[in-house]
Amino acid sequence: MQGSAIFSGVFELREGVCEEEFLPTLKAFYEHFIEVGFASGYRILRREALEGFGKTLPAFKYRGALIYPNMEREQAAYEYVKQDGEPVRSLHHAMNSKVKRGADFFVETCIVCNRSSS
């Protein structure tokens, strides 16, 4: 949807943490943002090697994308997390404790969107 905002994080899991252990914590974190009315959806993606490409990208295996209807909702969600209150504090800690240091984040806005690509 044009005008939507997507907050993405690229990261790797800590040593000894498996995907099956991690995914429920990220899902719970993302679903909380939907339940309280900030976000409209999410995607959790695993990076696949593409021979000959991606050499200039930072090292990451996963990308989590939290989808907002607009930048105002994304910014409100960011402020909500900064308040460090419950339950988002515990949900964030449960998820973040399984991720290696060095995760990186960015926000995008959709300028042209095709419904079939959602």
How would you name each of these model-derived features?
Residues M1-A5, K55-P58:
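Short, flexible turn/loop "capping" segments at secondary-structure junctions
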Residues S4-E12, R63:
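Active-site-flanking beta-strand signature of metal-NTP-handling nucleotidyl enzymes
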Residues L13-F22:
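Short, surface-exposed ligand-recognition loops at beta-strand->loop->(often short) alpha-helix junctions
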Residues L23-K27:
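Short amphipathic alpha-helical segment that frequently serves as the phosphate-/nucleotide-binding helix
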Residues H32-S40, G54-E108, C113:
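An amphipathic, aromatic/His-enriched active-site/gating alpha helix that lines ligand/cofactor pockets
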Residues E48-L50:
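A cross-kingdom feature marking solvent-exposed beta-strand/loop segments within repeated
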